[in-house]
A protein has these predicted regions:
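Conserved P-loop NTPase motor core
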Residues: 1-561, 610-611, 627-628, 632, ...
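Generic detector of ordered secondary-structure context
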Residues: 22, 58, 278, 325, ...
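Positions in alpha-helical segments
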Residues: 24-28, 596, 757, 817
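Active-site-adjacent structural elements in folded domains
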Residues: 107, 414, 804-806, 814
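Glycine-centered loop/turn positions within well-structured domains
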Residues: 216, 428, 723, 817, ...
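Extended, charged helical/alpha-beta scaffold domains that provide interaction surfaces
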Residues: 303-310, 316-323, 525-526, 533, ...
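Hydrophobic, well-ordered secondary-structure elements that form the walls
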Residues: 430, 478, 723, 759, ...
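Short Cys/His-rich zinc-binding micro-motifs
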Residues: 809-828, 832
Length: 834
């Protein structure tokens, strides 16, 4: 009793019940309204919101409106428990509603209410079949009420996606939402952005998306490209240089071209100006070639082993197989040593579902099974799980688990149970964990001539069709545990008298939640049903947690006459299994929490860069942004040669001029007389003023729109080039720090510290290059923005049910090249097999 009084979920349940009672009280009044009067409620509510009222002020009336509209437009009236579910969702919580309780209809109430704000509502499903189905069916209701509905699918053009997102309500998959967010932060014109601000999302099967897929990153990677020729050309060029063509700092491992070196580069590559905007990428190749040839040393920093460059660990001297230098340096070394130059693929944008969905102003979710993960939902997403009561009592029979010594005996028993119940005509759904198990059981049923369907989740349309018929008399369906989520199994004629749907589990899953989902396929809306799990000591879960102990106990119950097994059916075994599942769930939660801690580092960095990118796209004039970057650069330049609070010496002035003259400023642009005998702060101010003079000079010479576009072109290209390299570098760092635990170091702390240093370097590089290019580049009349990442491919870091679609057609990879889909497999073992 006292637990209930202090339980947040219990309090929320009581709160939403009061709201449902208020909605119920309005039912008769709203039935009396004409269609026109009911439809007029939508503009009426919008006007009230514009006049300062909140969504909570109109919640009860809006729910009552949508409920009555559903009756008229869909022929379905939400029950009280569905109104309770909608109220829980509006509170930014998870409504746990059993299978068959009408989650889709429940969502319409809260979606309608929140769509009235005009800020957009996203309804999120796990696949495009469900998104299309729900948008089509529920769209009838929303359109009746005067709201617009969009469907965001993978195949749509950017224009079609933008139209879908601009609707009051948008149906989409979780994957497509995440990819669109990433792509929006790679565009080069603000008009190309498709998403609006992330306002409110209702996530169907929320446990699947926010728990099961939490560790799956969404990745947009640059497709495999053959850049060997560019690396070879850059290598050939730097090998032709003489000592006076470059300045080298062995201690800092830093090298730059001198004025003579830059002149040679322009002649070698036939360029007018090496520091022109369009040459950012080429300069990157040259810089890597310089480092490879004059900073990196064979048999010190790396060795050649079996025709490949292998890094030498600077601390242990051991070869670091499987590791690569990032940002193209490894390929530059391959060019230097004339070994095979491997194609580059790089991660150019990435985000996890954990971080994506936490960006919504408000987040809510629905599922039949969330209570077991309530702590995780609360701690990571700040969402409570509200258990919504069923409309009718659950009368399903959940039998005690039975356990066998061997897997063979278990499957024989399952086949016997299926055969016996099939003879009576009772429909049977058999849940398996793997396709392999499904095929094994299918083989056994074929031998017994029992007709059945097997689902492998490869075709959503076919899957939904089979599941929808799985409750008919005589149906036998074998499916993976997750198959058919989102589609109800309705009982056929005469099935209630046979005991309803029989669900048999072939083994226990690692997660109690998945087992509960399988059970929940039976006994919907007060229907009868029966569920039972069959286990053996050879099951994976049992092997991991003390199967030997069970084998000893089971040895006493083997039939002594014929040696056959007698299954054990004791509740103690079920409790043992549940205990094992809790341990695994705890481990998985810890793992997801750890992933989030790593992701937090990149999340903060991504927010800064994406924020800066948006400023570039949306500000009319970015001169203040550029000026701020130039100030930081000038301060750093002075600080690199002297104490900025002291007076500059002749020697320091000489060093400074060597660094800036011809590199950060046009040759001879800095007057030595203006910096001698000045304090460091004054020197930095002078350099900044010269930057401003160059800006002003460009502004006077060209029309204002051309000048503004010039700044945006340079800054976008510099930011994107370095950010994409940084993403790739952070990915490699994450792999590298895993080895730190062996050296008694905290890998997370190492990742945080090194990641912070890398980001500081990234910011400095962006500021430095922006200053260099803007000061030295010539403005052209036909300036065009150009996307840095080309031939990109979106992947979710896991095998998908449908073929991934590259954004642009690319060169066909070789059989042993990495597959461009981003799976990490060789092409011949992935998409090359199709």
């Amino acid at each position: 009793m006292f637990k209930g009084l202090f339980d947040a979920g219990y309090k929320e349940l009581k709160r939403v019940e009061k709201i449902a009672d208020k909605v119920d009280a309005l039912a008769e009044d709203y039935k009396k309204l004409t269609d026109e009067e009911l439809k007029a409620k939508t503009p009426y509510f919008k006007e009230r919101l514009q006049n300062g009222e909140t969504l909570e002020d109109i919640e009860v009336e809006a729910f009552a409106t949508c409920r009555e509209a559903a009756t008229r437009a869909l022929g379905m009236t939400p029950f009280k428990v569905q109104i309770m579910g909608a109220a829980a969702l509006h509170g930014g919580n998870i409504a746990e509603m059993k299978t068959g309780e009408g989650k889709t209809l429940t969502s319409t109430l809260v979606v309608y209410l929140n769509a009235l704000s005009g800020k957009g509502v996203h309804v999120v499903t796990v696949n495009e079949y469900l998104a299309t189905r729900d948008a089509t069916e529920m769209g009838v209701l929303y359109n009746w009420l005067g709201l617009t509905v969009g469907l965001n699918l993978r195949e749509l053009t950017p224009e079609e996606k933008r139209a879908a997102y601009n609707c009051d309500i948008t149906y989409s998959t979780n994957n497509e939402l995440g990819f669109d967010y990433l792509r929006d932060h790679m565009v080069i014109y603000k008009e190309q952005i498709v998403q609006r601000e992330l306002n409110f999302a209702v996530v169907d099967e929320v446990d699947s998306i926010l728990i099961d897929e939490a560790r799956t990153p969404l990745i947009i990677s640059g497709a495999a490209k053959n850049t060997a020729g560019t690396y070879q050309n850059a290598d050939m060029f730097v090998k032709s240089l003489k000592a006076e063509d470059y300045d080298i700092d062995e201690k800092a491992k830093h090298i730059v071209l001198t004025e003579s070196g830059m002149g040679k580069a322009e002649r070698f590559f036939n360029l007018d100006n090496l520091y022109d905007v369009k040459n950012v990428t080429l300069l990157h190749y040259i810089q890597n070639a310089l480092r490879a040839n004059y900073i990196m040393h064979k048999d010190v920093d790396y060795v050649i082993h079996d025709g490949a460059i292998i890094i030498v660990d600077p601390f242990t001297g051991r070869l670091m197989f499987g590791r690569q230098y990032s940002e193209g340096l490894h390929q530059a070394l391959e060019a230097k040593e004339h070994v095979e130059i491997k194609k580059e693929t790089k991660t150019v944008a990435t985000i996890t579902f954990q971080n994506y969905f936490r960006m919504y102003h408000k987040l809510a979710g629905m599922t039949g099974t969330a209570k077991t993960e309530e702590d995780e939902f609360r701690n990571i997403y700040n969402m409570y799980v509200v258990e919504i009561p069923t409309n009718k009592p659950v009368i399903r029979i959940d039998a005690t688990d039975v356990i066998f010594m061997t897997m063979k005996a278990k499957f024989d028993a399952i086949a016997n149970e299926i055969e016996e119940r099939h003879k009576k005509g009772q429909p049977i759904l058999v849940g398996t964990i793997s396709i392999e198990t499904s095929e094994l059981l299918s083989h056994l049923l074929n031998k017994r001539h029992i007709p059945h369907n097997v689902l492998n989740a490869k075709q959503h349309e076919r899957e939904a069709e089979i599941i929808s018929h799985a409750g008919e008399k005589g149906a036998v369906t074998i499916a993976t545990n997750m198959a058919g989520r989102g589609t109800d199994i309705k009982l056929g004629e005469g099935v209630v008298e046979l005991g309803g749907l029989c669900v048999l589990g072939t083994e226990r899953h690692e997660s109690r939640r998945i087992d509960n989902q399988l059970r929940g396929r039976s006994g919907r809306q007060g229907d009868p049903g029966y569920t039972k799990f069959f286990l053996s000591t050879e099951d994976d879960l049992m092997k991991r947690f003390g199967s030997e102990r069970f084998k000893t106990l089971l040895g006493f119950v083997v039939n002594q006459k014929d040696g056959s097994e007698v299954p054990l059916e004791y509740k103690m075994f079920s409790k043992f299994v549940e205990s094992a599942q809790k341990k695994i769930e705890g481990n998985n939660y810890d793992s997801r929490e750890q992933v989030l801690k790593y992701d937090e580092v990149l999340r903060k960095q991504r927010e800064i860069i994406y924020g800066q990118r948006n400023d570039i796209l949306f500000y009319d004039d970015i001169t203040p942004i550029i000026t701020k970057m130039m100030k930081s650069t000038c301060d750093r330049l002075v600080h690199s040669v002297m104490d900025i609070n002291k007076v500059i010496t002749v020697e320091d002035a000489k060093k400074l001029l060597e660094i800036v003259d011809g590199k950060y400023f046009p040759l001879g642009y800095i007057d030595p007389e203006q910096i001698l005998n000045k304090k460091g702060t004054e020197v930095a101010e002078y350099l900044l003023q010269r930057c401003k003079d160059l800006l002003e000079d460009k502004k006077e010479k060209f029309p204002e729109p051309v000048y503004k576009e010039f700044l945006k072109v340079i800054l976008l290209r510099v930011v994107d080039t370095y950010w994409m390299d940084h993403i790739d570098s952070m990915s490699e760092l994450r792999q590298a720090v895993r080895l730190q635990s062996y050296a008694q170091k905290n890998p997370l702390r190492e990742y945080q510290e090194i990641g912070f240093e890398k980001f500081e370097t990234l910011v400095c590089n962006i500021e430095d290059d922006a200053t260099k290019f803007i000061n030295r580049a010539q403005i052209q009349d036909n300036l065009q923005r150009e996307q840095v990442a080309k031939n990109t491919v979106a992947s979710s870091g896991k095998e998908e049910n449908t073929k991934r679609k590259p954004v642009k057609k690319e060169e066909k990879p070789g059989p042993n090249d990495p597959c461009p889909c981003g799976s990490g497999l060789k092409y011949k073992k992935c998409c090359g097999r199709k």
